C-alpha cells in the first residue's frame, strides 16, 4: 500500500487501475490493494413478501428510487417503468425494445448510461413466470449458459459512464465485480420467509475500466 501511495502522489493523473498495473503486482497483491481502496459496503436486511415483479417489492423499490437518475437502461424491464430505455423479450410489454437482452445491450453506446437495472430470470421457473412461456426455448438456453450472463455483464460495464451505478437483483452478491472495475456500495438482503430464497440486491459504482 505504501508503494501505491508513493506512486499516486508522483502520478496524480493516473487512475487506480493504471497505477496497479504499472507497479507490476501479482494478482493477489492487486486484489488486496483494491479491497483497501474500496469504501465500506452498507448492508441492510429487510423482510418483504415476494413478488415476480421485483421492483414492486417495497424495500427494493425504495432502494432503486434513491439511485435512478439520468439515462436508466433496463434490459429485463417486464412491467417496470424505472428505465428511460427499456427492453423486454415479450412483445406484450410496454418497452422500447423487444430483443434478447444481450443483443439489446450491444445496441447501447459506450459510456451512455447513468444507471443500469439488471434483474434477469435466474431459473427456468422464473423465466416461465416472468415471460408467460414467451420465447421459452431461447430463455432456457440463456438461463443455463453462464457465458451468456458474463457477456451481459461485460456489456453493462461498457455502457455505464464513469461513476455510473449498476443495481442487480438475484441470489448472490457477486455483482458486476472488481475485475470489471466496479466497487460495491450497498447490499440489500430481502428475506421472504419459509423456503423461499432471499432476494439479494447489489449496488455498485463503476470506478475504473477492466482491471485484470
Residue ranges and their predicted role:
Residues 2-84, 195-198:
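S-adenosyl-L-methionine
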Residues 70-107, 125:
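SAM cofactor-binding core of SAM-dependent methyltransferases
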Residues 106-117, 124:
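A short acidic, Gly/Pro-enriched loop at the edge of an enzyme's catalytic core
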Residues 117-128, 142-143:
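A short SAM/SAH-binding and catalytic strip from SAM-dependent methyltransferases
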Residues 120-121, 170-172:
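Short strand-turn motif at the edge of the Rossmann-like AdoMet-binding core
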Residues 135-162:
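A short glycine-rich, Lys/Arg-flanked "PGG" loop and its adjoining helix->strand segment in the class I
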Residues 163-170:
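Conserved beta-strand signature within the Rossmann-like core of class I S-adenosyl-L-methionine
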Residues 174-212:
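Class I S-adenosyl-L-methionine
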Amino acid at each position: 500500500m505504501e508503494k501505491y501511495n508513493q506512486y499516486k502522489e508522483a502520478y496524480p493523473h493516473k487512475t487506480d487501475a493504471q497505477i496497479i498495473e504499472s507497479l507490476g503486482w501479482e494478482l493477489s497483491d492487486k486484489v488486496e490493494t483494491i479491497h483497501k481502496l474500496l469504501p465500506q459496503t452498507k448492508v441492510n436486511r429487510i423482510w418483504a413478501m415476494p413478488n415476480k415483479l421485483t421492483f414492486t417489492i417495497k424495500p427494493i423499490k425504495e432502494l432503486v428510487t434513491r439511485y435512478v437518475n439520468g439515462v436508466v437502461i433496463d434490459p429485463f424491464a417486464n412491467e417496470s417503468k424505472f428505465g428511460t430505455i427499456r427492453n423486454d423479450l415479450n412483445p406484450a410489454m410496454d418497452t422500447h425494445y423487444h430483443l434478447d437482452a444481450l443483443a439489446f445491450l450491444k445496441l447501447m453506446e459506450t459510456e451512455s448510461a447513468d444507471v443500469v437495472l439488471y434483474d434477469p430470470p435466474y431459473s427456468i421457473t422464473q423465466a416461465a413466470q416472468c415471460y408467460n412461456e414467451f420465447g421459452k426455448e431461447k430463455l432456457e438456453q440463456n438461463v443455463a449458459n453462464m457465458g451468456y450472463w458474463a457477456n451481459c455483464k461485460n456489456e453493462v460495464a461498457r455502457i455505464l459512464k464513469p461513476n455510473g451505478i449498476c443495481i442487480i437483483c438475484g441470489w448472490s452478491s457477486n455483482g458486476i465485480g472488481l475485475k470489471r472495475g466496479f466497487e460495491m456500495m450497498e447490499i440489500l438482503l430481502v428475506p421472504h420467509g419459509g423456503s423461499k430464497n432471499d432476494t439479494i440486491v447489489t449496488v455498485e459504482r463503476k470506478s475504473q475500466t477492466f482491471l485484470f
